[in-house]
Design a protein with these regions (language model features):
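Short acidic-hydrophobic, aromatic-tinged amphipathic segments that line or gate anion-handling sites
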Residues: 96-100
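Amphipathic alpha-helical interaction surfaces in cytosolic regulatory modules
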Residues: 22-94
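STAS-typified acidic loop motif
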Residues: 2-29, 51
Length: 100
């Protein structure tokens, strides 16, 4: 997995490529822990995410909770396959998710 973070003021976009699973989740967890406390908006760009496991879903929830009370958290450029995982788990009811 590769993560490219882009910061514009207090807004951060993380472009995540590859698989987000048990082996790669610690890398994203480290990125989330390093977020500036002044970050008001977080976007996960999943344009190149091929797969997400329960470990990845756990980090999505962690990011959602971390951004609670701020401008927000959303996920963009989600493939149909990854969107199906969010839909089956009900995450699409809580989190702003935009398909490709």
């Amino acid at each position: 997995m590769e993560i490219v973070s882009k910061t514009e003021g207090s807004k951060v976009t993380m472009e995540i490529t590859g698989w987000l699973d048990t082996q790669t989740a610690p890398q994203l967890e480290k990125e989330l822990s390093a977020l500036d406390p002044g970050t008001t908006s977080l976007v996960f760009d999943f344009a190149n995410l091929e797969y997400i496991s329960s470990a990845g879903l756990r980090l999505v929830i962690a990011a959602y909770k971390k951004m609670a009370g701020k401008e927000g958290f959303r996920i963009v450029n989600v493939s149909d396959e990854v969107y199906d995982v969010f839909s089956l788990t009900g995450f699409d009811q809580k989190i702003k998710i935009e398909k490709k």
